[in-house]
Amino acid sequence: MLILGIDTSCDDTSVAVLENRNILSNIVSSQIKFHSKYGGIVPEIASRKHIEWIWDVTEKALSEAKTDLKDIDLIAVCYGPGLIGSLLVGLCFAKSLSYASGKPLVGVNHIEGHIQAIFLEKSYPEYPFLCLIVSGGHTSLYRVNDFGAYKELGRTRDDAAGEAYDKVAKMLGLGYPGGPVIDALAKEGCNEKFNLPRPYLHGSLDFSFSGLKTAIKVLLKNLGYKEGNVPDEIKKDIAASFQTSVVDVLIEKIKWAISSEKLNRVVITGGVAANSELRRRAEMLKDKGINVYLPSKSLCTDNAAMIAITGYNKFLKGEISDLFLNARAYLPL
């Protein structure tokens, strides 16, 4: 079966073609250069770029997969959560293709897509397993009992981890997005230079990163530096200290979840799962007998392949969406 996957949930226009569970193409067109000067994503710009690019990206995905639209058997599309204007572009496009071709349509939850991304890899866990989704919009822990059977164990109470990265990067004058540049700078800094808080929220598997962000703001003030005007060496040390604090919390929460759920299989996914320090620390958990699974970096960030495989699995269970499917900015799993 050939599946066409479409994801326009945020600022990446992505289209993929899968043959069952095998990736034939997975095209991602990034809008970063259009948003970076604003320090974050501008929803209207994101929507307009999706409209401009969606057909070209689809043609590229089909071409790379050496197939044609008429050969596609199933169309899977992300319908939430995300930016409503962005979601509507991909959803309306997918519904139009479905209507014109008569091919079945399956709507996919973006968060479920991140969880299922690991099954695109050669190495993946048996059910049940724990899953940490950590990205710019989400930081949540789930117990995954089976496909479609998810129990939320904890979530962020304020800023998601990726959002905290972006906000700290802005304070340091590093631009947008903050994750990759902080990750790179942290390798050159001392992570013990500044003693930043670790918001563990003892007794809970929830997350909270707003206090850590505030601690950086106070630190800059105490050091006598204005936001956006910080010496390079200080930037490096703050980046290293901040990243260590975030990763410490994420790893500790995983350990707590393993203990409470009596499970030693863990998937870490989402855009922040591409972070080198988080991946390094996650690999170290294997020394403690914990089975850790990380998608390749290209499958951690937003992509349509994860939407396609999730749609495929839903289709196999007999789940099909109609043309009245609506985009949902907020969509619980």
Swiss-Prot record:
Cytoplasm found in the keyword field: yes
Record's catalysed reaction(s): L-threonylcarbamoyladenylate + adenosine(37) in tRNA = N(6)-L-threonylcarbamoyladenosine(37) in tRNA + AMP + H(+)
Record EC number: 2.3.1.234
Subcellular location: Cytoplasm
Pfam families found in the cross-reference section: TsaD
Similarity field: Belongs to the KAE1 / TsaD family.
Official protein name in the record: tRNA N6-adenosine threonylcarbamoyltransferase
Gene from which the chain derives: tsaD
